[in-house]
Swiss-Prot record:
Record keywords: Ribonucleoprotein, Ribosomal protein
Gene assigned in the entry: rpmH
Designated name of the protein: Large ribosomal subunit protein bL34
GO cellular component: ribonucleoprotein complex; ribosome
Source species: Tolumonas auensis (strain DSM 9187 / NBRC 110442 / TA 4)
Entries under HAMAP family matching the protein: Ribosomal_bL34 (MF_00391)
Coiled-coil regions listed in the entry: none
Length: 45
């Protein structure tokens, strides 16, 4: 049986990266919330 998690740095960046967050209103809210909370990393490394 194939496992469900098949890691890819490129897909990760495209879906969860900074630029994709900034591209939508919801994404910007995510960043704002993480800034307000004081997260060291706003998006995936």
């Amino acid at each position: 049986m194939k496992r469900t998690f098949q890691p890819s740095v490129l897909k990760r960046a495209r879906n969860h990266g900074f630029r994709s967050r900034m591209a939508t209103v919801g994404g910007r809210k995510v960043l704002a919330a993480r800034r307000a909370k004081g997260r060291a990393r706003l998006t995936t490394v």
